[in-house]
Amino acid sequence: MTLWMASPPEVHSALLSSGPGPGSVLSAAGVWSSLSAEYAAVADELIGLLGAVQTGAWQGPSAAAYVAAHAPYLAWLMRASETSAEAAARHETVAAAYTTAVAAMPTLVELAANHTLHGVLVATNFFGINTIPIALNEADYARMWTQAASTMATYQAVAEAAVASAPQTTPAPPILAAEAADDDHDHDHDHGGEPTPLDYLVAEILRIISGGRLIWDPAEGTMNGIPFEDYTDAAQPIWWVVRAIEFSKDFETFVQELFVNPVEAFQFYFELLLFDYPTHIVQIVEALSQSPQLLAVALGSVISNLGAVTGFAGLSGLAGMQPAAIPALAPVAAAPPTLPAVAMAPTMAAPGAAVASAAAPASAPAASTVASATPAPPPAPGAAGFGYPYAIAPPGIGFGSGMSASASAQRKAPQPDSAAAAAAAAAVRDQARARRRRRVTRRGYGDEFMDMNIDVDPDWGPPPGEDPVTSTVASDRGAGHLGFAGTARREAVADAAGMTTLAGDDFGDGPTTPMVPGSWDPDRDAPGSAEPGDRG
């Protein structure tokens, strides 16, 4: 409660005088009174209607069920009328408390007059002649202070009591018979247990995301004030939201019961399977039947899933089958490659035809070997030009060029008709490739070299007693003109002169002794220094 004594009376008087007044409270009380009268009028009308039903032509159990279905709603109307009337009375009480507080509160004029009188008395208090009037004035101001504080405290207590005692109107019950409610949902289990903080968090998130259009009450199990079971149209998006919340709460309840009482947990889940899930499946089927497009999409997804399942089943059946044995090819002796011998013919006309005609006799054995498999392809006509004779077979396909045989032939060679011919051709190609990849190795018996550090008289030495011929002249035999065939020789290029004897220079008599190994004896090897007996 507010400590009203701490404030001067001017504050309380100003608050009451400057407020909106009792007009708004009395207006609210009038609205509540009219609402109470409306509820009472509807209740009276319903009572008359139910009485007419019971006394009219409608007789039997259905009429009684109709009256019984409206009984809760009729009771709610009468209770709502009483609640509204009581709320109106509470508003009138608050308005009366405000009016009383304003009447009991010292006015600002009275307070101002007290302050003015106090100032005059103090100003004219010569020799203390106004002491008693000043004391009386101050006592009157203290009375107004206490009166203002007590008035505000009383007004606060009456207003708070009226607001706290105002009854709350409950939601209207549905007008349904007990049998109809059971037919709508044939189970009496509870979707979820006690609400958890996570449930309230999810409810707040739904409210924020939907902009206040989805209000989930975890304690009551309602969505927008309507129970979950009243949402039966699966074509509406809110139905799926409600079902998602319902299934999550069902799973939460099952897990909680599983740790407390497993028997009740499985009994709860069994009730869901028997009563809850079939009801929702029927609702989905009804929604799909009303929308052919959704039905086509649902059937398409089901058919595609069935096709995938049957496909995997077929693959599993194939996994159990034994693969058929593949017959092995009979080994065929590879025909030895024959090299066509080409005659040296300097002819210039039709070199391709000449080579083909010369190679025909030599390739006859190979053709006879595989004659049973396939006939030999006709020779490809060659282009006009110089024909270079070869002593070996010309380069085949894959030798050095990436071109295929069809690039120079007018038509393709016929394919072999049997596996034996293909095997023979593959063997020939493998042997040819092996020969091309073979490398020449040096013989092992050519690794010794001759030692020249021995005394041996050369065979080209002069006879005993004669001087050696020291002059070396250029040979008059040449190697001829070198270069590529078909090129012209330039006459300005001088021919090689060979080895010549250098003439003596101005500083010596002639060429000096060349640099020789230290193991050679120059005196012994000089001309004329050796004795005839030593040469023997």
Curated annotation (Swiss-Prot):
It comes from Mycobacterium tuberculosis (strain CDC 1551 / Oshkosh). Signal peptide: none annotated. Residues 521-536 have a biased composition (Basic and acidic residues). It comes from the Bacteria. GO terms for biological process: response to host immune response. Residues 501-536 are annotated as: Disordered. Pfam families: PPE, PPE-PPW. The gene is PPE3. Belongs to the mycobacterial PPE family. This is Uncharacterized PPE family protein PPE3. InterPro entries: PPE-PPW_C, PPE_dom, PPE_sf.
